[in-house]
């Protein structure tokens, strides 16, 4: 059975051009008119970025059309401004160290410590909002699986589960299950959780084709909406736009913070308004344990009446290299571990010395009110750009290829949490969740032993084991390793451990897959 599934997946990937099959080249656009070219050249010359057109006369008509279409929407003066600010940030004299404090108790909760009745109340409220078609999901899925040894979008990656389901499939089936639960609980038959999927230039086509091949994982295709994050030119250390070839500027995605501009530019916010969406859950594709549109999180955030809420997990120890969610000068913010001195990193909680004072690790798992997303045009221009120094293949002034062996330029990025400080504390909240239940990121290649396919698979299988034991089943195994004692529970029959009563009193031999009642 597993071999048959694997063959099917391999055939599908081949059909998607993810296994080396060449695509037919798309026709190149027509070149600009003489007047259009003159206007473009003047725009870039005035910004002292005219070198992007150095080799214009050498280009074919198709290459001219392609370069023109790429350069036309770029504002080189804007690139100059953000490059200058990012490369040469202003230094404030006598700048005081920022005041860092944990969130006040009024803005936080923990599923680890909270009573079950309160959690159940939030879950019920969240599921009711889902039943009223007021909840949507935004997935950040622009990354490729390069570090995993795959050219496919990261969401297509198979972490090695017995079912061989991809990350996309796990998440899509959780949405399907939630719709089913809301339908059944509130006697509806038309519950919809729209799934907005942000791709990037390199992943857009392959992602959409993957969803087509997989029949949208049982979801209505009209409620799965793809959109693309923006790109920014890569620049030299001196602020000059780098050219990848004579007919193409080097560009890179604008970071996960580009989601806000993309939501507006692609019409997603308008679509949400037309659907009556009020509550939005946003997350990254690489977390195999993510509780998509988590009713408990939605209910908690809605009850608080906040514009943004975020999930966190407890920092493992003082040295774990994670960003921390906290108050910075009285505003919600995320502070990188490099900004924390050892004294602050090791400080313990005033009420419980076994806990770190600053322990809310950022897992990029957020709630937004629709009103906040609708206000994006009022503040998106204030988001800072961050510099990521990279080795960027390009051409030199003579048009010769340059393959640098050390960073030669920068990619400009925005971070999704850069808007947090725009809010007052009363409009922000944080929910601490169990790491083993909700966070297992896929970052590294197989065999790394940390945040890799093996740890992702292990965490899914151990969660399934806990689900079954919670339902009253007994797990046995002939294998001596922990992974051999795990069970894969399909999201189609259980979102968070519910619906498994039929296993009460039964003995399940692991490893096993529970796909349906039997």
Locate the predicted segments by residue.
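Structural beta-sheet core signal
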Residues: 137-139, 197, 226, 282, ...
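Short loop/turn segments at strand-loop or loop-helix junctions that form parts
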Residues: 138-142, 229, 433-435
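Residues at the starts of beta-strands that form the adenosine-phosphate
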Residues: 194-195, 223, 307, 427
């Amino acid at each position: 059975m597993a071999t048959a599934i694997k063959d099917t997946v391999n055939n599908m990937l081949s059909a998607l051009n993810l296994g080396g099959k060449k695509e037919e080249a798309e026709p190149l656009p027509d070149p600009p008119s003489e007047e259009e070219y003159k206007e473009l050249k003047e725009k870039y010359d005035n910004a002292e970025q005219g070198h992007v057109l150095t080799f214009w006369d050498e280009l074919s008509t198709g290459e001219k059309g392609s370069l023109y279409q790429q350069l036309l929407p770029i504002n080189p003066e804007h690139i100059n401004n953000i490059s200058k600010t990012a490369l040469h940030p202003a230094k404030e004299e006598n700048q005081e160290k920022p005041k860092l404090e944990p969130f006040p108790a009024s803005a936080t909760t923990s599923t680890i410590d909270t009573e079950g009745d309160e959690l159940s109340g939030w879950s019920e409220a969240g599921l009711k909002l889902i039943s009223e078609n007021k909840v949507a999901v935004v997935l950040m899925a622009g990354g490729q699986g390069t570090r995993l040894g795959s050219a496919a979008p990261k969401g297509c990656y198979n972490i090695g589960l017995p079912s061989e389901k991809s990350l996309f499939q796990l998440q899509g089936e959780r949405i399907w299950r939630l719709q089913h639960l809301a339908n059944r609980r509130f006697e509806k038959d038309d519950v919809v959780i729209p799934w907005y999927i942000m791709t990037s230039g390199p992943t857009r086509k392959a992602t959409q084709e993957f969803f087509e091949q997989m029949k949208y994982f049982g979801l209505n295709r009209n409620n799965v909406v793809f959109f693309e994050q923006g790109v920014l030119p890569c620049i030299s250390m001196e602020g000059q736009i780098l050219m990848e070839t004579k007919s193409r500027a080097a560009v890179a995605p604008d970071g996960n913070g580009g989601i806000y501009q993309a939501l507006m530019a692609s019409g997603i916010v308008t679509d949400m308004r037309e659907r009556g969406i009020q509550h939005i859950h946003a997350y990254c594709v690489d977390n195999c344990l993510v509780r998509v549109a988590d009713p408990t999180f939605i209910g908690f955030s809605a009850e608080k009446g906040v514009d943004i809420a975020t999930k966190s997990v407890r920092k493992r120890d003082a040295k774990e290299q994670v960003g921390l969610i906290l108050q910075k000068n009285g505003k919600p913010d995320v502070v990188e571990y490099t900004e924390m001195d050892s004294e602050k990193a090791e400080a313990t909680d005033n009420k419980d010395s076994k806990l770190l004072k600053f322990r809310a690790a950022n897992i990029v798992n957020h709630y937004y009110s629709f009103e906040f997303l609708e206000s994006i045009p009022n503040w998106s221009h204030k988001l800072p750009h961050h510099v990521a120094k990279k080795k960027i293949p390009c051409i030199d002034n003579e048009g010769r290829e340059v393959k640098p062996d050390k960073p030669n330029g920068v990619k400009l990025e925005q971070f999704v949490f850069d808007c947090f400080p725009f809010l007052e504390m009363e409009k922000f909240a944080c929910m601490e969740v169990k790491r083993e239940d909700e966070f297992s990121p896929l970052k590294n290649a197989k065999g790394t032993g940390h945040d890799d396919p093996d740890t992702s698979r292990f965490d899914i299988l151990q969660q399934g084991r806990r689900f079954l034991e919670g339902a009253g089943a007994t797990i046995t195994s002939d294998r001596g390793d922990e992974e051999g004692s795990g069970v894969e529970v399909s999201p189609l029959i259980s979102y968070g451990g519910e619906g498994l009563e039929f296993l009460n009193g039964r003995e399940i031999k692991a490893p096993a897959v529970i796909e349906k009642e039997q």
